[in-house]
Structure formats: structure tokens, C-alpha cells
């Protein structure tokens, strides 16, 4: 692990040197959720799997377009500046492609959308091919042989969804993300966090030009699904659509507001990082409170001993760096 940690530190320093040279600053409360380590052959892929098994937990190994990709979580995080990175993705090389062995990129979950990222870094060399994906699209900043990528869901949250086969199949099969793609759909809520209970629904946030358009949009795409209904929420300036697909309940929440800036997403981002910092013990506490009837944000507030309005407290925590969150959870 020590040799791997040294290599990771060197990689991260090289990336940040390139970012600094382009005046690209990452906010300290953004989540560097994983690193990607590429290998040059299938033989080396299997060799690294054996090495990783001695100091990391295998979260999942999947076949992606004909090649295996393994994801590991380290018991001890790789610390760099204010970030503590625990997850590493290990893809086997694509057949016929020459791959340089070593760390290649890291991925970031930010609290701003792709358009704002492009506006913030106007001189960056963006690759937008990953934006075509309906599920967890990504925007890349190319840095020569290295890169960073932005995506709305951390890799660990994606893996939690993939392991919940019925829910993952419903998300894919319903086409909800594809049909709402031009409205910045964000998948949030308890399923990606692994704290879902009986009755939990799949939560999706979208941005619409006006609320009347939202109702029209919902009827167009979802009126044929079971238990479809829409509801206006004046207190939130929002409209929701709820429906069932393959026995899985969905709720789509629409506001005239950038999806990334909506409170539902900011709460989700805070909770995702708190579970990253607090680990399995915090997750178990939250799940027990949820099963006892607490809603998600009050459950976090109770587990963390937060005073005041739980929703406001989580918005406050969302802006803290990981170092500050770790201090809070001591």
C-alpha cells in the first residue's frame, strides 16, 4: 500500500500542477471520489487485482463493453491536501489499444452543473463525449496524458445502485433519465446512498423553463406508467410527478432552477460525503433511524447531534471541506 500511496501522491501533484498552470481551482468541498489506474495488459490487470486484494476491499467487478473493470475501496484513504480518496477503479485495457500503465485521471462530484464548469474554466481543454451518456454523464478536462472528469454521482453511489438490481433495471428501463436529458436530470435520494427503506422512491431532480411546462413534460413521458400523478408544491415553487415502473416508485421534482443548485441535490451531496467520511458505522445509524420512521435529513441531524433545522444544517455542512467534516465527526 505504501508504494501505491506514493504513486498516487505523485500523480495527484502532477495533475494539480497542470491545473494550477491553467488557473483551474477545484473548490475544497468538491468530492474527489475516485482515482483511475490503467494497466497495459490483461495479465497485469490480474496481477494488480491480487495486489489490491491485500489492502483493499473489492466493491465490484463488472464486464463493460467486453472488458473487466474492478473497483476497490481502501481501508486507509489516500490523503492529498483537503481530500481523502478511498476508491480506485482498475480497468483492463481495451482490446487492441496501447495503454500507458499508471494513474490516468480522477473524478470529481461538484455542486455546479456542466455548463457552469465550462464557463468557470473557459481556457480548459474539454472533452464532451461523455455527456452523451444518459446515466451519470461526465465532462472531461484533458491535461495531456492525464485528465480530470466531473460527474454527478460518485462511483461508489453508482455501484450501490448497480447492486440493487431491481432499482437499477427500473432506472434504465423506464428511460426517465433519457427522456428528461435536456432538463439536467440528477438522480439523488436514498438508493444511491444505500439508506433506502421500504417505501423509498427513486428521486430525480430536473430544471424546467416554467412549472406549466413541467406538467406537460410529465404527462408526455410518464402518464402511461402505473399510479401516475402530478402535484404542485407552492411552498417549494415546484411540481412533482410520481409513478411506478416495474414495481419501483419514482418521484421527479421540477423547479425553475439549475438542478445542481436545488436543495435536494445539495442535501444529497452533503449526505454522500458524510457517509464517505463516517463509513459503515454512520450508515448503519442512519439506516436504523430511517427504519424507525425518520426522514433522511432529520436522521442525519440526529445521528450527528446537530442542533437547529436539519435541512439548513446539511446545507451548511455541504460547504465544508473533507478535513472539516472529519473534524466534525471525531
What are these regions (language model features)?
Residues 47-56, 117-123, 214-223:
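Short amphipathic alpha-helices in soluble, non-transmembrane regions
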Residues 31-40, 94-116, 204-205:
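Vicinal oxygen chelate
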Residues 22-57, 194-202, 207-208:
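N-terminal interaction modules that seed assembly of large macromolecular complexes
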Residues 70-78, 224-258:
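Conserved catalytic core of two-metal-ion nucleotidyltransferases
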Residues 175-212:
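Active-site nucleotide-donor binding segment shared across nucleotidyl transfer reactions
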Residues 1-5, 163-188, 330:
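Helical scaffold of the NTase/Pol beta-like nucleotidyltransferase catalytic core
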Residues 117-162, 286-299, 305-330:
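Glycine-rich, aromatic-bearing surface loops/beta-hairpins
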Residues 2-19, 55-97, 131-159, 248-254:
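Conserved short beta-strand elements that form part of the metal-binding/catalytic scaffold
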Amino acid at each position: 500500500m505504501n508504494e501505491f500511496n506514493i504513486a498516487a501522491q505523485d500523480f495527484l501533484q502532477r495533475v494539480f500542477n497542470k491545473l494550477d498552470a491553467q488557473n483551474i481551482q477545484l473548490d475544497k468541498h468538491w468530492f474527489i471520489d475516485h482515482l483511475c489506474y490503467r494497466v497495459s495488459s490483461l495479465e497485469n490487470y490480474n496481477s494488480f487485482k491480487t495486489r489490491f486484494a491485500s489492502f483493499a476491499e473489492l466493491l465490484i467487478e463488472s464486464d463493460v463493453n467486453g472488458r473487466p473493470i474492478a473497483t476497490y475501496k481502501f481501508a486507509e484513504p489516500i490523503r492529498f491536501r483537503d481530500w481523502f480518496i478511498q476508491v480506485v477503479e482498475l480497468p483492463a485495457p481495451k482490446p487492441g489499444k496501447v495503454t500507458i500503465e499508471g494513474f490516468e485521471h480522477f473524478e470529481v462530484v461538484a455542486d455546479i452543473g456542466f455548463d457552469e464548469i465550462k464557463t468557470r474554466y473557459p481556457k480548459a481543454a474539454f472533452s464532451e463525449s461523455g455527456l452523451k451518456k444518459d446515466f451519470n454523464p461526465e465532462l472531461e478536462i484533458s491535461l495531456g496524458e492525464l485528465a480530470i472528469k466531473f460527474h454527478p454521482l460518485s462511483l461508489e453511489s453508482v455501484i450501490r445502485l448497480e447492486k440493487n438490481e431491481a432499482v437499477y433495471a427500473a432506472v434504465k428501463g423506464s428511460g426517465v433519465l433519457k427522456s428528461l436529458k435536456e432538463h439536467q436530470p440528477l438522480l439523488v435520494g436514498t438508493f444511491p446512498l444505500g439508506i433506502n427503506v421500504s417505501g423509498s422512491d427513486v428521486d430525480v431532480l430536473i430544471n424546467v423553463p416554467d412549472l406549466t411546462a413541467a406538467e406537460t413534460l410529465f404527462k408526455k413521458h410518464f402518464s402511461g406508467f402505473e399510479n401516475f400523478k402530478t402535484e404542485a408544491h407552492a411552498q417549494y415553487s415546484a411540481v412533482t410527478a410520481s409513478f411506478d415502473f416495474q414495481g419501483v416508485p419514482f418521484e421527479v421534482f421540477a423547479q425553475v432552477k439549475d438542478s445542481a443548485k436545488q436543495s435536494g441535490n445539495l442535501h444529497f451531496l452533503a449526505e454522500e460525503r458524510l457517509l464517505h467520511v463516517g463509513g459503515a458505522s454512520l450508515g448503519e445509524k442512519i439506516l436504523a433511524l430511517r427504519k424507525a420512521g425518520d426522514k433522511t435529513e432529520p436522521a442525519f441531524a440526529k445521528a450527528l447531534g446537530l442542533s437547529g433545522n436539519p435541512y439548513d444544517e446539511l446545507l451548511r455542512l455541504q460547504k465544508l471541506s473533507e478535513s472539516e467534516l472529519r473534524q466534525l465527526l471525531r
